[in-house]
Amino acid sequence: MKLIVAVVQDQDSNRLLKTLTDHNFRVTKLATTGGFLKSGNTTFMIGVEDIRVNKALSLIKENGQKRDQMIAPVSPMGGNADSYVPYPVEVEVGGATVFVLPVDEFHQF
Protein backbone atom coordinates (compact mmCIF):
# COMPACT_ATOMS: atom_id res chain seq x y z
CA MET A 1 0.00 0.00 0.00
CA LYS A 2 1.12 3.56 -0.76
CA LEU A 3 0.14 7.03 0.38
CA ILE A 4 0.06 9.59 -2.42
CA VAL A 5 0.38 13.21 -1.31
CA ALA A 6 -0.47 15.53 -4.19
CA VAL A 7 -0.28 19.33 -4.01
CA VAL A 8 -2.29 21.16 -6.69
CA GLN A 9 -3.54 24.70 -7.21
CA ASP A 10 -6.97 25.46 -5.80
CA GLN A 11 -8.22 26.08 -9.35
CA ASP A 12 -7.60 22.42 -10.21
CA SER A 13 -8.76 20.85 -6.96
CA ASN A 14 -12.50 20.37 -7.54
CA ARG A 15 -11.99 18.79 -10.96
CA LEU A 16 -9.30 16.47 -9.58
CA LEU A 17 -11.40 15.52 -6.55
CA LYS A 18 -14.34 14.59 -8.79
CA THR A 19 -12.12 12.58 -11.13
CA LEU A 20 -10.47 10.66 -8.30
CA THR A 21 -13.74 9.83 -6.57
CA ASP A 22 -15.33 8.84 -9.90
CA HIS A 23 -12.53 6.27 -10.20
CA ASN A 24 -13.20 4.97 -6.66
CA PHE A 25 -10.18 6.48 -4.93
CA ARG A 26 -10.63 7.49 -1.31
CA VAL A 27 -9.35 11.01 -0.94
CA THR A 28 -8.72 13.40 1.95
CA LYS A 29 -8.60 17.05 0.84
CA LEU A 30 -6.63 19.62 2.85
CA ALA A 31 -6.41 23.39 2.34
CA THR A 32 -2.75 24.43 2.28
CA THR A 33 -0.68 27.51 1.43
CA GLY A 34 2.40 27.51 -0.77
CA GLY A 35 5.58 29.08 0.54
CA PHE A 36 6.76 30.63 -2.74
CA LEU A 37 3.65 32.36 -4.08
CA LYS A 38 1.88 32.54 -0.71
CA SER A 39 -1.30 31.45 -2.46
CA GLY A 40 -3.86 28.76 -1.77
CA ASN A 41 -3.16 25.17 -2.67
CA THR A 42 -4.99 21.96 -2.07
CA THR A 43 -3.19 18.90 -0.77
CA PHE A 44 -4.75 15.51 -1.40
CA MET A 45 -3.88 12.43 0.64
CA ILE A 46 -4.79 9.27 -1.23
CA GLY A 47 -4.30 5.77 0.15
CA VAL A 48 -3.94 3.29 -2.72
CA GLU A 49 -3.02 -0.31 -3.32
CA ASP A 50 0.30 -0.71 -5.14
CA ILE A 51 -1.36 -1.85 -8.37
CA ARG A 52 -3.47 1.37 -8.56
CA VAL A 53 -0.64 3.88 -8.02
CA ASN A 54 0.00 4.45 -11.74
CA LYS A 55 -3.70 5.04 -12.42
CA ALA A 56 -3.90 7.62 -9.63
CA LEU A 57 -0.76 9.36 -10.91
CA SER A 58 -2.12 9.55 -14.44
CA LEU A 59 -5.39 11.09 -13.19
CA ILE A 60 -3.46 13.66 -11.16
CA LYS A 61 -1.29 14.50 -14.16
CA GLU A 62 -4.31 14.89 -16.47
CA ASN A 63 -6.11 17.23 -14.07
CA GLY A 64 -3.27 19.50 -12.93
CA GLN A 65 -2.77 22.27 -15.48
CA LYS A 66 0.33 24.44 -15.68
CA ARG A 67 -0.28 28.12 -16.37
CA ASP A 68 1.66 31.38 -16.34
CA GLN A 69 0.95 33.94 -13.63
CA MET A 70 2.28 37.44 -12.98
CA ILE A 71 3.52 38.05 -9.43
CA ALA A 72 5.08 41.03 -7.68
CA PRO A 73 8.33 40.05 -5.95
CA VAL A 74 8.66 40.70 -2.23
CA SER A 75 11.03 43.48 -1.16
CA PRO A 76 14.57 42.23 -0.48
CA MET A 77 14.36 44.24 2.76
CA GLY A 78 11.47 42.11 3.98
CA GLY A 79 7.97 43.47 3.67
CA ASN A 80 6.93 46.48 1.64
CA ALA A 81 9.44 49.31 1.50
CA ASP A 82 8.44 52.68 0.00
CA SER A 83 11.65 52.97 -2.02
CA TYR A 84 11.35 49.50 -3.55
CA VAL A 85 9.21 49.33 -6.69
CA PRO A 86 8.88 45.71 -7.77
CA TYR A 87 8.36 44.82 -11.40
CA PRO A 88 5.93 41.97 -11.95
CA VAL A 89 7.56 38.69 -12.89
CA GLU A 90 5.90 35.93 -14.90
CA VAL A 91 6.24 32.49 -13.33
CA GLU A 92 4.87 29.08 -14.28
CA VAL A 93 2.45 27.75 -11.69
CA GLY A 94 0.13 24.80 -11.49
CA GLY A 95 0.64 21.22 -12.34
CA ALA A 96 1.06 18.95 -9.36
CA THR A 97 3.78 18.15 -6.87
CA VAL A 98 3.36 14.51 -5.91
CA PHE A 99 4.98 12.31 -3.26
CA VAL A 100 4.44 8.54 -3.16
CA LEU A 101 5.19 7.10 0.27
CA PRO A 102 5.21 3.51 1.53
CA VAL A 103 2.60 2.63 4.17
CA ASP A 104 3.71 0.14 6.82
CA GLU A 105 0.29 -0.20 8.40
CA PHE A 106 -3.24 0.97 7.69
CA HIS A 107 -6.05 0.94 10.26
CA GLN A 108 -9.62 2.07 9.88
CA PHE A 109 -11.66 2.28 13.08
Curated annotation (Swiss-Prot):
Transmembrane segments: none annotated. Disruption phenotype: Not essential. Coiled coil: none annotated. Keywords: Cytoplasm. Its main location: cytoplasm. 3',3'-c-di-AMP binds at residues 21, 25, 28, 35-37, 41, 47, 92, 94. InterPro entries: CdAMP_rec (IPR010375), N-reg_PII-like_a/b (IPR011322), N-reg_PII/ATP_PRibTrfase_C (IPR015867). Gene3D superfamilies: 3.30.70.120. GO terms for cellular component: cytoplasm. Binds cyclic di-AMP (c-di-AMP) and is probably involved in c-di-AMP-mediated signaling pathways. In vitro, can also bind cyclic GMP-AMP (3'3'-cGAMP), with lower affinity, but not c-di-GMP or 2'3'-cGAMP. Homotrimer. Binds three molecules of c-di-AMP, each in a pocket located between two subunits. c-di-AMP binding is accompanied by conformational changes of both the fold and the position of the B-loop. This is Cyclic di-AMP receptor A.
